[in-house]
Amino acid sequence: MLSTFINRIGERTVSLAISYYEMMLFTSLCILNILNPRTYNSEMATHLMTQLYQTSIKVIPHFILIAAIFGSVVIGLVIVIASDFSLQIQVGSLIVTFVINEFAPLLSVFFIAYRFSALIHREASFIHFDGEIQLLHNLIIPRILSTVLSTMALSILFSMIMIMSGYLSVFFILGMDLHTYKYLVFSSLNVQNIFILLIKSSLFGSIVAIVALYNGLHVLKPKHNASKIFVILFFIEFLSLFIQKVFNAIQ
């Protein structure tokens, strides 16, 4: 019985290692094609615009509502915690760091993953079923690019909406006027925050698309998407926090 258990663990470990290795090869192939100028043509551009409409423009009303609700609640919690620790003067820095660097990319990619991961998986399954893997340039690459661009755009939109809706929390909790709130937020905002937002959202978006496409092409169940996506996202989030701490320590 013990030997059977050990064999199962070994088989599972080898299977996971092979799966992640093949996914890395698939990722490398996609990156090489994205960087190849020959990939881009009129047909590919048409598919890209269609995918962008489906993954970003079409869902903006729902996303704005979610961002406004979460913005008021989350920033309210940040302000309450700041008040408890007498950090009112650093409210702007806390809001900018928490919203732009951490919360906006994560919530945006979770929204994209929840709405479109299964759809991407089904599309890839149909491509596999129809034997149309050769249409990498016109189907797979546009889907990856559209997911990346949509995640970046929604992250920026989410940050703006959260910061604007967060003023309500600041006003009711601290009684802060709009001019002071704008000064604290904009004085805390810098190029590094925008850079981190764009890098994180682009990485997160590419992970969602590549994992869903890979599982679809290999006819894996959609539930495999979520587990792989969450593991990779939280690893990147932890790594980014570590890099930020090291960077701040060096400065």
Predicted features and spans:
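Hydrophobic alpha-helical transmembrane segments of multi-pass membrane transport proteins
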Residues: 92-128
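Selective transmembrane-helix segments that form parts of the transport pathway or gating/packing helices
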Residues: 56, 60, 64, 139-163, ...
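Membrane-interfacial helix-loop-helix connectors in multipass membrane proteins
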Residues: 77-100, 148, 157-202, 211-225, ...
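Juxtamembrane boundary at the C-terminal end of a transmembrane helix
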Residues: 239-251
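Membrane-interface helix starts
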Residues: 39-48, 53-65, 228-231
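Active-site cofactor/substrate anionic-group-binding motifs, chiefly glycine-
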Residues: 55-107
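Short cytoplasmic-facing helical segments at TM-TM junctions of multi-pass membrane proteins
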Residues: 122-144
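Short, membrane-interfacial amphipathic segments enriched in basic
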Residues: 2-48
